[in-house]
Design a protein with these regions (language model features):
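Beta-sheet-dominated interaction scaffolds and their linkers
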Residues: 21-53, 157-171, 203
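Short acidic, flexible loop segments centered on an aromatic residue
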Residues: 53-75, 181-198
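Terminal connector regions
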Residues: 103-155, 221-244
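Positively charged n-region of N-terminal signal peptides that target proteins for export
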Residues: 1-4
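Intrinsically disordered, low-complexity Pro/Gly/Ser/Thr-rich segments with frequent PxxP/GP/PP motifs
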Residues: 73-106, 196-223
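Intrinsically disordered, low-complexity segments enriched in serine, threonine, and glycine
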Residues: 165-244
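Bacterial N-terminal signal peptides
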Residues: 6-15
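Buried hydrophobic-core signal for structured, non-transmembrane domains
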Residues: 46-52, 100, 115-120, 175-180
Length: 244
């Protein structure tokens, strides 16, 4: 899940990190999950529930965008999904169920596709004292982008643990190459070379059938261990492999 902050003249969008919460948390805007799986068999669409536990009234703007769209971009490239309702009143203690539906059936059938479910909660009123010296008012909006994976019916069902086991690691010079031979997107959790945690950065999510390269400063490691994030947003059991 991506959470960001962007600033425009007279209107400030602040990070939702403090108020967007995972399932089970007691306060904030609670999300049904931290990622969304859209199975190809869902011909009538899927639902996703968002709960307002902030005590404040919001307008919730919801849409699906290409994954990696620039935060705050007013008109990102179209994605083949609609969300209903696209804009809704979001009162305290409301549990709003969104309906997400595929509108074009031209996505690849031999691998997953990834998009972003963009959720922007805009307060119905500015907070007291939010007016700046110039007279502009600050509007504090919470925005989250969750990964939405389209999973074609043609794919063989593979558990998250099996996807983790399928990953292939090898050393080439000072780089660790990680290959994903599956038709699924795989998000790495924690990777360790010997006992040292590897800094992954943008290489954390592997596209289907792709390879990423991670720089490994220091001595050549003898082994690697890893886990991945499953469909529920939780880490799988750790796997390990010799690099000899």
């Amino acid at each position: 899940m991506r959470v960001w902050a962007s600033v425009v003249m007279g209107c400030f969008f602040l990070s939702a990190a403090a108020q967007a919460t995972a399932p089970g948390d007691s306060a904030g805007i609670a999300l049904e999950s931290t990622r969304v799986i859209y199975p190809g068999s869902a011909t009538k669409g899927i639902s996703f529930t968002v709960t307002n536990r902030t005590g404040q009234m919001y307008l919730l703007q919801s849409r699906v965008v290409p994954w990696g769209a620039v935060p705050g971009e007013s008109s990102p490239a179209a994605a083949p999904f609609i969300v209903v309702p696209p804009l809704a009143r979001f009162a305290p203690d409301d549990a709003l169920t969104l309906r997400i539906r595929l509108t074009k059936h031209d996505l690849p059938t031999d691998r997953e596709s990834v998009f972003g479910l963009s959720l922007k909660a805009i307060p119905s009123q500015s907070a007291p004292g939010s007016e700046s010296e110039s007279g502009a008012k600050m509007v504090l909006a919470l925005q989250n982008n969750l990964k939405l994976f389209y999973r074609p019916t043609e794919l063989a069902e593979i558990t998250a643990e099996a996807r983790a086991q399928a990953l292939q690691f090898r050393l080439q010079g000072t780089e660790l190459k990680v290959h994903n031979p599956t038709p699924y997107y795989v998000t790495l959790g924690e990777v360790k070379a010997d006992s040292k945690t590897v800094v992954l950065g943008e290489e954390r999510m592997l596209a289907p059938f792709s390879t990423v390269e991670v720089n490994l400063p220091g001595a050549r490691p003898k082994s690697v261990s890893w886990n991945i994030i499953n469909d529920d947003g939780r880490p799988t059991p750790r796997q390990s492999q010799s690099l000899d």
